Amino acid sequence: MQTKTLFSRHYLEHHLPDHPQWDEDPRPAFDAVRELWQKARRHGDTWNEAQTEQEFIQPVLDLLGWSYVVQPEAHRGGRVTRPDYALFPDDETRDAAYPHQGDDEAFYSRARAIGEAKYWGRPLSQKHASGRETWKPGNPSHQMVSYLVGTRVAWGILTNGLIWRLYSREVSSTASEFYEVDLGLIFDFLPQGGAPTAAQLDQFRRWWLFFRRASFAPDPQGKSFVQRVHEGSATYAREISDKLKELVYEEVMPEIAGGFVAYRYHELGV
């Protein structure tokens, strides 16, 4: 699991289990994805993008409960301007969106998220040798920024099959702030034909909970699971920052000041 500031790592480790969704059983989904994974590991390196989608990504989206529309590519100035997938909460909402294809505002306003797929294992962030990302159309992270801005959808999922990233349109640095899970770190270390350990199932749960359709559905208060985790994480980070400031002013600064006074008295005689 990796997070680049979209969610606080400490919050995920210590407070995510406090959410009621944590108690849901991920094992049926785990077993289904594991079967798909075994095939992908045998053949994925030979797949192109369309094959990766057909053989792995679309079956996984189905298991996650999504209804979706695969978008025909739309080009403007040599750039692709639409994401691969519009992700809907159910078939009824998806079917209601079909007549609005071509009217992006009406179409995407019905979507809960957008999805962008790449061929198996394709790097999701292209970088200079210096390690800094470059802004160009071929960079998947920056494509996701463009799609989120263009469609005005709140959430985006980017994946190459192996790695899954969740992006939010509401953060300040959309391209570099994401929640990432590497499925290889879960499924490549399972005992051959055996049951997963509790720790491995927990790691899978941290993927399943953030990418399934149900986690983007509003609760009776109008907020989804991913919204609540994002808000809880931000609140937690602010509280930690405030506590650190209090510690500096109440404990650290007096000690520094006391040390300075003692130095002047003993060393300078003032």
Residue spans of the language-model regions?
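Short glycine-rich, polar/acidic loop-and-turn segments at beta strand-coil junctions
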Residues: 60-62, 91, 119-121
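Acidic-basic catalytic patches of nuclease active cores, encompassing PD-(D/E)XK
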Residues: 41-78
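Short, basic/polar, glycine-containing "phosphate-handling" surface segments that engage DNA
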Residues: 1-40, 96-113, 117-270
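A short catalytic or substrate-binding loop motif that flags glycine-/basic-rich loops and adjacent residues
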Residues: 76-81, 158
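Charged, often glycine-rich, active-site loop that binds/positions anionic groups
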Residues: 79-92
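Gly/Pro-rich turn-and-neighbor structural signature
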Residues: 69-74, 92-100
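Generic alpha-helical scaffold signal
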Residues: 46-54, 79, 109, 134, ...
